[in-house]
Amino acid sequence: MKLVIAEKPSVAMSLAAVLGATERKDGYLEGSGYLVSWCVGHLLELAQPEAYKEQYAKWRYEDLPILPENWKYEVPKDKKTQLALLCRLMKDKRVDSVVCATDAGREGELIFRLVYEYAGCNKPMERLWISSMEDAAIREGFDHLRPGSDYDKLYDAAVCRAGADWLIGINATRLFSVLYGVTLNVGRVMSPTLALLVQRESDIESFISKPFYVPEITCGGFTASGEKMTERSEAEKIRMDCDHNSAFVRSVEKQVKTIQPPRLYDLTTLQRECNRIYGYTAQQTLDYVQSLYEKKLATYPRTDSQYLTKDMQATAASLILWLRDNMPFGKGCAGEPDIDRVTDDSKVTDHHAIIPTVEIARTDLTELPSGERDVLTLLAVRLLCATTQAHRFETVTAMLDCQGHTFTAKGKTILQSGWKEVERIHRMSIRQSETEHRENEDAALPVLKEGQTFETVSASLREGKTSPPKHYT
């Protein structure tokens, strides 16, 4: 009999349903040769300093640094019952092997291994490593369980990360708190991140906005701009020189440019995009996509890859076709899907990019919580964008001369909307303002030729102020 240990109850229930372990027991499920139980997050945590020496209970400068030779762990009071159950199940004579089915990542490995070692278990250990909670993916994963030893280095990395956090957090927090007489929390990741925020805030507060002036001429239905100036008098002189005088086109440069489709989402890029579009925090996005994963609607979220593996191409192709036919933004796609563009086995380590699963075709999205619906929709949009045509446009840069002064006019003509059409339809569906996407875009220019003359131009002065750095989002 195999003992399967998941990271949380909801995942255990999904695994048990596929495995046929349907008989409910106190803290686990049983059936078809399986016992399926769960952790509740971390059941063991690194002990506080006083667990090593009683004198460390008091924060004193002379005790620093605190450097344990061997790590000690403690069990949170609210998790003792579940830990005791798992220890008992591991020692159950019916169990001949244990399957680590915690999240397929560094922290999931740590959660399971600490329990396995705490229980003193020496039964064979296997690893379930899947990127989707779909039934088919679960079956495939259990058909190809991997030796637990394959992930020893992943466990070592998790222990190192936890230890580094403890050493820096405990010692630096105590040091600065003692020196300054007030509790100052210091963390390995938190403190440098906070330093970036403080520096940016300082830059914003100390920023002194300065005015600038740009002489412009309007001729033939378009506007050309001169050099940005800090002295109004200089800009005004140019305006007066040019107003109601003639101008001619000195040069016209045309260039066709291509913007390739974006890559699929890894967790970081998904969090960044959800913050930009919806204002969700990184934690909110992670919570939403984790819930989608557990509902079998999205693949594993904690990934740093933006590519798929070759064995996913057939599934991805059918999913893309369904999205094109059934989602409003799907009509923005053109041409055959280019799945090869998002496929690269060499760029996938533990998990592939985050995409929807085929379960989306059997789900009423209106029944999902709004945050989950937003994230799932964004995953679908990105999958279509990444596999449709490139965005192509022609830029035109015209240099004009008016009374010896140089002016520049820029324009852009869309040749092929490509993936940006999918994005545009999605933006309209969520009523996102088009202004923020078009404010930096150039309108199309009329046809211009070198030497072309405009007999009378209208000159004006555009005023503005320099802007401070933006806050981080």
Q: What are these language model-derived features?
A:
Residues 35, 43-77, 88, 181-290, ...:
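Long, highly charged, low-complexity internal segments
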Residues 337-367:
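Acidic, turn-prone loop/beta-hairpin segments
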Residues 1-162, 166, 437, 442-444, ...:
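Intrinsically disordered, low-complexity regulatory segments
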Residues 157-187:
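Amphipathic alpha-helical segments of the small helical/lid subdomains adjacent to P-loop NTPase cores
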Residues 11, 107-111, 156, 160, ...:
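Hydrophobic (often cysteine-bearing) scaffold residues that line and stabilize catalytic clefts
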Residues 23-27, 148-153, 174-178, 202-207, ...:
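Active-site phosphate-binding and catalytic loops of NTP-dependent enzymes
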Residues 9-10, 39-41, 103-109, 130-133, ...:
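An acidic- and aromatic-residue-enriched active-site/binding cleft used to recognize and process polar
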Residues 280-348:
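Extended, well-ordered alpha-helical scaffold/bundle regions in very large, multi-domain proteins
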